[in-house]
Amino acid sequence: MASLSGTNSFVKVCGVTSMLDAQLVIDAQATALGLIFAASRRQVSLEGGREIAQYAKGAILVVGVFRNNEPDFILEVVEQVPLDAVQIHGELDGNVLNVLRRRGLGVIKALSIDDDDFFDFDETAVDAVLVDGPTPGSGAAHSWDALTKRSFAVPVIVAGGLNATNVAGVIEMTGAWGVDVATGVESAPGVKDRELVVNFVSAAERHYSLGKERGD
């Protein structure tokens, strides 16, 4: 994927709602931050998302997150907000995909571990898949057993109930290329905690570095 191809691992802090928290995530040296444009406790407006993205652009990868949004709205956001990649929960519209490709944006398709199409989805049309639990953004942990029964042809990002304490173990268990966190680094919904963010990013990157040393 054009905007993410230079990364050997991927640590994303999702649900950023302010420039203050964007800077916090940048300072922690995460790979990416996520701006949620779907209905959520961490939702940002088009204008707010644009302001944060413009502030963070170049310092960190900026991912726009959508869940069952209308295709026209996704295209409007892509037109007005300087994103590096788009993460889609729900149906991936063909026209939207074509526009994202023309713009050179990375495309991440989110799959719930209990979705009917988890085993049937053709991931070759996207750049990465994000595997989450049945209720994204809830902070609830879930079983990763399904990932031992399903291989993907593209990089895999895991999410759901992650925090600084368990992230290394989840990476080890799943072999995931990337990790994604929201609730596990917050003091309140949409409010990031500096210490939790730093500890999470450090724990994830430390394990990825260890894997490289081992030749994983």
Describe these PLM feature segments.
Residues 1-216:
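Conserved N-terminal beta1-alpha1 strand-loop-helix module at the mouth
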